[in-house]
């Protein structure tokens, strides 16, 4: 079922003129999709409650650094089948069905969101109040018709609470005015977590006994990069040049860190290189010792990395390697 859903999402994104990465296995996301300035990090799950805390944290952190929208596409929750046209949320990440995603890409955003107690909608509180006062309808009258308290009506008008879909429809019909607002899932998510500090990254890697990764991340941090260490992605770290604030000129390096090189490492590095090209960024494979030069992969030994002065020098090094491979 998951593979079918993944295939359907790939077809939909191609039809919608997105550029798409190759699918990843055992990652916090399955696809990266890009169209103009819009970027999606997509996780496909049959059961959206199977997303782990660790996966969600990493997905959110990568999304923040890449200025992308993280989204889960699934078919059910732990207890029931997901409703079409409804937005669910897991660990701060929006979760929807394939059909809801398709409608959103077609310009038809969902209007209902799932929360404790049922399904709710966002309404325009200012329009509600203006219309009620214009029609000379009291708060008490509207509360009686809607079967909620006067206090609740006041909260709706102040946008301090949202009604259930059933209550919202009653109010709209009584006032004869549209109040329900769509939920734009492609809006950049507020409150995305910041990337981990170097100390947090070290603590996690230390537990896994990966001293070589610590050395590499330490060197990159000393150069001046913002760093995000990952364990649930096809790359081991994302390094962002601290000085760059203009997102159009964002210098990001997707970094794979391995002591030894083998066919699996090269395959993984080539996938990451494709991601970097898609996102107009860079990729780098750092090894204990370099073996054979691969024309498709920009790689360097840790001793070479230690000789690099700062972020500018490393980016220049990568650019030169890229150009030499194109010749």
From Swiss-Prot:
CDD domains documented for this protein: HTH_XRE
PROSITE patterns, per database record: HTH_CROC1
This protein's UniProt keywords: DNA-binding, Transcription, Transcription regulation
Gene3D superfamilies, sorted: lambda repressor-like DNA-binding domains (1.10.260.40)
Molecular function GO terms recorded: DNA binding; DNA-binding transcription factor activity
Chain ranges passing through the membrane: none
Residue spans binding DNA: 139-158
HTH cro/C1-type domain location: 128-183
Name used for this protein in its record: Putative HTH-type transcriptional regulatory protein MmarC6_0210
